[in-house]
Amino acid sequence: MKVIGFNHVTIRVSDLQQSLGFYREILGMDLIHQGRRDVYLEWGTAWVCLMEKKGERRDDMAGLGVDHVAFTIAEEDFDEAVEKLREHRVTILRGPMERGGGRVINFLDPDGVQLELYTGSLEERMKVWE
């Protein structure tokens, strides 16, 4: 499997509007999509998703921070990549499935970090929301 590039990182936040202000006003990211509980920002060639995780108990807030890191791979490499993950008995969380204009699979690395392989582009994903 050949990784074409970094696709995006999703960060779970406690207050979407506060975080959106920080990433836009302080870091200078451009807002490209705003949903009910998530936003997508662009920063040069980097793409960042902020996903709100509301919780009243302290335990509920333990999941804040990086949710997953996604890498772009070629469509023609996707099935082989999925097969390799299965052969090595990697824990698959979601997928493989069609999502946001591409094919996607989410899985865990040996330390439990969630990773994603995605065949689409930011532009293809944005078309889904138009």
Model feature map: region roles:
Residues 17-30:
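Amphipathic alpha-helical segments
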Residues 28-33, 92-95:
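Short secondary-structure junctions
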